[in-house]
């Protein structure tokens, strides 16, 4: 059993049951997926045969629920200022949680939301937290995993304080967590280029949010520079962050047992990137 759960966001095209197969093919022991089309509001319910096959394939290839990170639709805005869009987003988010529960999955990764220049940051963060509370009341078992953002436009979640404010207002603290995306973190202004910078950034996360809330990570290099507030992923070692950060994460025991998911731009080298991270992880533990 590897201590590091390393994988990529694989396609579920042709059925969710194919995602674990694709993850296994690239040497992953973790993976992310969309359980429905991420660019559409409506989705037909999961078929019983797909659910059975998904669970069987996960069992066959050794993927436990702690290693699988479903991502919700990009259309959902849990902080939407317009009541109609908010209601639609909340209903869609509950549906995403239900799909996770049907598949036996316990994590749901999502982007927190945007104020669209219509309400204050504080009001939007409170709305996001209430959206999570409403979903928790309707769906058991599934943990809402808030992804930090790069800070583009009016998107919230780029400052660690935003994440802390949401968590503070979520009633069931056992069912809320954070997914830190390295590209987003760097683009938001938190340096990761050296081990010293990583020490400082994760110490700040511990101070503001708490490492015990870290449920997953997206492992991406960045095309944009530090504090660019631009969400543009790059292959590992080819962007502005560089390999030192990814070696740091692979070798630090604080990141054991959570999905470390590539969303890098060239799927053809995912297997190589996973193998490199795995090699780093076996060299030493900090």
UniProtKB/Swiss-Prot annotation:
It catalyses: Endonucleolytic cleavage to 5'-phosphooligonucleotide end-products. GO terms for biological process: base-excision repair. The keyword Aminoacyl-tRNA synthetase does not apply. CDD domains: AP2Ec. Zn(2+) 1 binds at residues 71, 111, 147. GO terms for molecular function: deoxyribonuclease IV (phage-T4-induced) activity; DNA binding; DNA-(apurinic or apyrimidinic site) endonuclease activity; phosphoric diester hydrolase activity; zinc ion binding. Zn(2+) 2 binds at residues 147, 181, 218, 263. Binds 3 Zn(2+) ions. Its cofactor is Zn(2+). Keywords: DNA damage, DNA repair, Endonuclease, Hydrolase, Metal-binding, Nuclease, Zinc. Its EC number is 3.1.21.2. Zn(2+) 3 binds at residues 184, 231, 233. PANTHER family: APURINIC-APYRIMIDINIC ENDONUCLEASE (PTHR21445:SF0), ENDONUCLEASE IV ENDODEOXYRIBONUCLEASE IV (PTHR21445). Belongs to the AP endonuclease 2 family. Endonuclease IV plays a role in DNA repair. It cleaves phosphodiester bonds at apurinic or apyrimidinic (AP) sites, generating a 3'-hydroxyl group and a 5'-terminal sugar phosphate. HAMAP family: Nfo (MF_00152). This is Probable endonuclease 4.
């Amino acid at each position: 059993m590897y201590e590091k759960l390393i994988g990529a966001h694989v396609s579920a095209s042709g059925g969710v049951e194919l995602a674990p197969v694709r993850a296994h093919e690239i040497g992953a022991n973790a993976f992310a997926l969309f359980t429905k089309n991420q660019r559409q509001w409506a989705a037909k319910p999961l078929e019983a045969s797909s659910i059975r096959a998904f669970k069987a394939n996960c069992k066959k290839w050794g993927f436990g629920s702690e290693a699988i990170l479903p991502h919700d639709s990009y259309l959902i805005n849990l902080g939407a200022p317009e009541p109609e869009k908010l209601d639609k987003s909340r209903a869609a988010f509950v549906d995403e949680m239900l799909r996770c529960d049907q598949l036996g999955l316990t994590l749901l990764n999502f982007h927190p939301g945007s104020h669209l220049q219509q309400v204050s940051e504080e009001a939007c963060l409170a709305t996001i937290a209430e959206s999570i509370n409403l979903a928790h009341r309707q769906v058991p078992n599934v943990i809402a995993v808030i992804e930090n953002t790069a800070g583009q436009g009016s998107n919230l979640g780029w400052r660690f304080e935003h994440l802390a404010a949401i968590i503070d207002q979520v009633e069931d603290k056992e069912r809320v967590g954070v997914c830190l995306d390295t590209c987003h973190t760097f683009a938001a202004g938190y340096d990761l280029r050296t081990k010293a910078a990583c020490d400082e950034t994760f110490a700040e996360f511990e101070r503001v949010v708490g490492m015990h809330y870290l449920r997953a990570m997206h492992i991406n290099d960045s095309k944009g520079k530090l504090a660019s507030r631009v969400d543009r992923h790059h292959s590992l070692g080819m962007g502005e962050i560089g390999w030192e950060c990814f070696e740091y994460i692979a070798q630090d025991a604080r990141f054991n047992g959570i999905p470390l998911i590539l969303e890098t731009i060239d799927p053809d080298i995912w297997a190589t990137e996973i193998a490199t991270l795995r090699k780093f992880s076996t060299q030493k533990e900090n």
